[in-house]
Amino acid sequence: MAGSPSRAAGRRLQLPLLCLFLQGATAVLFAVFVRYNHKTDAALWHRSNHSNADNEFYFRYPSFQDVHAMVFVGFGFLMVFLQRYGFSSVGFTFLLAAFALQWSTLVQGFLHSFHGGHIHVGVESMINADFCAGAVLISFGAVLGKTGPAQLLLMALLEVVLFGINEFVLLHLLGVRDAGGSMTIHTFGAYFGLVLSRVLYRPQLEKSKHRQGSVYHSDLFAMIGTIFLWIFWPSFNAALTALGAGQHRTALNTYYSLAASTLGTFALSALVGEDGRLDMVHIQNAALAGGVVVGTSSEMMLTPFGALTAGFLAGTVSTLGYKFFRPILESKFKVQDTCGVHNLHGMPGVLGALLGVLVAGLATHEAYGDGLESVFPLIAEGQRSATSQAMHQLFGLFVTLMFASVGGGLGGLLLKLPFLDSPPDSQCYEDQVHWQVPGEHEDKAQRPLRVEEADTQA
């Protein structure tokens, strides 16, 4: 174990005690409040004389499987690019998502499906919980390698609550449409993580600079995450949209947007790369921006051409962000964004929200016909004009940025509590701080980790 005996003793107790407390408290709350909904409960379902073929499970579960794979495989492997942080990237993704999906079931349940004193859960609850876990993992990407697992669990504890409140305000109070989460998931998760990273700024992080890069095999493993995310992203955006034409259209728009963002990424990467060569960081990340940018508008009548245009724009903007804006973010704004979530989720998320404003403002009864009610119910009912819906969409973006910024600031203050274990500057981005790494003898391979230097900690 790297570090002093007192640090090792604290690490031995801190994570187990926190995991036991959080799981125990969650289990008690589940026992008191959580019940099956009428589509899951044996007695209620059969009492209603429905055919099993009508159960929502058969319509939603295939999408849930894809979303689940994205959260646990896609996000986990996308972050293994760091040469000595693969165990932590995949392992802490596993830990955070497993806790976040339980906690978000409770938080979202109290806000969305609390009836008769109970939270009623089904397959839609599982999808919503995974969406929330995705936002937490986006924030994790901004502080990857600089925080301990106990800090990350506390981050998730706070972020899930704020995610649920922000989502409730946007979807239920403002009537915002955001099927694929450009605002509620990507923008919120990115800027929560970026503000958190700013509060946890480490001026002496250069001591771990030699571990911040990738090696050939770590980039190859990260591409596994990229491919999983790329393939399943149409399901992610379409998972909770209206069955039928709405879900079909959402998947189609996402499909074309991802394809265009990939070509845009390859084009810009070669254009701005050294000697015209491609940068694997760009390909791993910016190629996915097409899925983010149509998150809000994918269920709308965006048109295939609109999806291609939005995807290409997102891929180019994301690539330029990785090449030029990411260094400025650290040097000028003191935001140490490990995974570049600002370029993959932040900027494309904001662009996606603005695209939603535009497409909502163009909505007409002629274009949507009877389908207007499933996409823009308030417009269909005459309670709101298309212009008013567009303004509500824009206001939803500002609300999301406010919740994310305030939440990230509060989270940073929470994670800076002195008793929380975090790696010193000289030991960041290193698996051996928290993991037993097979095939390596610490005394020989990681002797520098035993040196306690005077430096900052998160």
Swiss-Prot record:
Topological domain spans for side Extracellular: 35-61, 108-124, 171-178, 241-251, 304, 368-393
SUPFAM superfamilies for the chain: Ammonium transporter (SSF111352)
GO molecular function per UniProt: ammonium channel activity; ankyrin binding; carbon dioxide transmembrane transporter activity
Glycan-modified residues: 49
GO cellular component, one term: plasma membrane
Subcellular location: Cell membrane; Basolateral cell membrane
Extent of motif Basolateral sorting signal: 429-432
Key words, A-Z: Ammonia transport, Cell membrane, Glycoprotein, Membrane, Transmembrane, Transmembrane helix, Transport
Region Disordered, annotated ranges: 439-458
Coarse class of the protein's main subcellular location: membrane
Membrane topology of the entry: Multi-pass membrane protein
Gene Ontology BP annotations: ammonium homeostasis; ammonium transmembrane transport; transepithelial ammonium transport
Stretches in topological domain Cytoplasmic: 1-13, 83-86, 146-149, 202-219, 273-282, 326-346, 415-458
Transmembrane spans: 14-34, 62-82, 87-107, 125-145, 150-170, 179-201, 220-240, 252-272, 283-303, 305-325, 347-367, 394-414
Reaction catalyzed: NH4(+)(in) = NH4(+)(out); methylamine(out) = methylamine(in); CO2(out) = CO2(in)
Highest taxon listed in the record's lineage: Eukaryota
Post-translational modifications reported in the UniProt record: N-glycosylated.
Region (Interaction with ANK3): 416-424
Function: Ammonium transporter involved in the maintenance of acid-base homeostasis. Transports ammonium and its related derivative methylammonium across the basolateral plasma membrane of epithelial cells likely contributing to renal transepithelial ammonia transport and ammonia metabolism. May transport either NH4(+) or NH3 ammonia species predominantly mediating an electrogenic NH4(+) transport. May act as a CO2 channel providing for renal acid secretion.
Protein family (similarity comment): Belongs to the ammonium transporter (TC 2.A.49) family. Rh subfamily.
PANTHER family xrefs: AMMONIUM TRANSPORTER (PTHR11730), AMMONIUM TRANSPORTER RH TYPE B (PTHR11730:SF42)
Quaternary structure annotation from Swiss-Prot or TrEMBL: Interacts (via C-terminus) with ANK2 and ANK3; required for targeting to the basolateral membrane.
UniProt name for this protein: Ammonium transporter Rh type B
Gene name per UniProt: RHBG
